[in-house]
Amino acid sequence: MIMSNTHKARLERRVTGSTNRWRLPKQPFSGDLLSLSQMCKALSIDFEEALRNPDRLCISQIQKFFFENFKNKDIQSGEADVILECLGFKWELHQPQLFQSETLAKLYLKALAQGTTHPLRELEELLRAQSPKKTKEKSPAKRIIISLKINDPLVTKVAFATALKNLYMSEVEINLEDLLGVLASAHILQFSGLFQRCVDVMIARLKPSTIKKFYEAGCKYKEEQLTTGCEKWLEMNLVPLGGTQIHLHKIPQDLLHKVLKSPRLFTFSEFHLLKTMLLWVFLQLNYKIQAIPTYETVMTFFKSFPENCCFLDRDIGRSLRPLFLCLRLHGITKGKDLEVLRHLNFFPESWLDQVTVNHYHALENGGDMVHLKDLNTQAVRFGLLFNQENTTYSKTIALYGFFFKIKGLKHDTTSYSFYMQRIKHTDLESPSAVYEHNHVSLRAARLVKYEIRAEALVDGKWQEFRTNQIKQKFGLTTSSCKSHTLKIQTVGIPIYVSFAFIFPAS
């Protein structure tokens, strides 16, 4: 097996008590093995009791001792100090590497105490064997056998072997198919360095096919960084990626609910989000389908239910109501999209009636959305996905007879700006766009409360840029038609740009 040489540098020491006993400064319980027994005496700790109860020992400081003394040494082959019986195998390990795992360290110390009537003398022999003065002497400490029982089904022999290999080598490659098993092994071993590395790799490798397993692992091991990473990734990619891939059906309902409630959720429009959610429900009920269905197939499926009861009022749909209550149906204003809502037989009649009433009042009052107050939870959302090939990108949107262009510009490799501006209906690229919305507002000014957000992923972390929540009157002249501009610097691609706004009473 392998073993590293001892580091020559000595840790700084400080005298403890009236005798020649010492500890490391600023450490309540030193991990320097040469002073471990003396430390217990100086701090009035029953050393043999502490040895029999390894939880009292500060394993992290013992780990620090080995790290400081062995980190710059080449690993050599040598006789193993410990035999680990686990998963039907016997694994040969060495003390300096073993102490990186809190679980193995505690098992080792417990076995050391149980295997002799003089545990203090036994440990002192071990400490002398680790002394820099004894590097050429063979360790007098006997081989100790420890056992570890693992019941976690995620832990495979290959994954566990990879985890143990990481005790000796810091940059062992972890295959994607073994990643969950290595994470589980690191959790059981209490090998914090490897566990964190697995979490970082998982966050970097999030995609529609992996998010379910990674999110469930984060929940299982109570790893908030991983679950939060999954939530943030899905907030940006639910509509752009999830809505186009068969893996959408794997997304757990609780994760989906969190994402739908988030003000960071990116969508091209409220109707795009609705279509994504209808597809998710369709895939839950038709889980044997192997290819993404067409939009027409999904619509036909829901229209096939008897008209006497909408889908969300049926037993099969009631549990999904919390998800669809998160949707902003009031933000669906295009005539043909409203027709889809009405004839889909998916939503309760009371929901659709409220949408109709809100639209009627807004149209009667020149677009004023008097029923909307909070920009974070009620605003109408539109989005741009700015990719590598884009130098300029824009979309025209319409709301209650007002037309806006949302636009993004790339100035150089890392500089971008985003804004929106009001345009005249006569400036639309196609006259059919006017007829599509059925009406045009002739008001000279429109008060708008809005916010522009942009997010990009850089080195596994999300960069977020945003304007303040701004109230502004948009006119039709050059000086009054343009919003504030969001200017950003980022190397991340793609950039997810969200425009959220409300028409307050004016």
Swiss-Prot record:
Domain of life, per lineage: Eukaryota
Pfam families documented for this protein: BTB_BTBDG, BTBD16_C
Domain BTB: 150-206
Matching InterPro entries: BTB_BTBDG (IPR056426), BTBD16 (IPR042833), BTBD16_C (IPR048859), SKP1/BTB/POZ_sf (IPR011333)
Coiled coil start-end: none
Cross-referenced Gene3D superfamilies: Potassium Channel Kv1.1, Chain A
Protein name: BTB/POZ domain-containing protein 16
Species whose genome carries this gene: Homo sapiens
Gene name, Swiss-Prot/TrEMBL: BTBD16
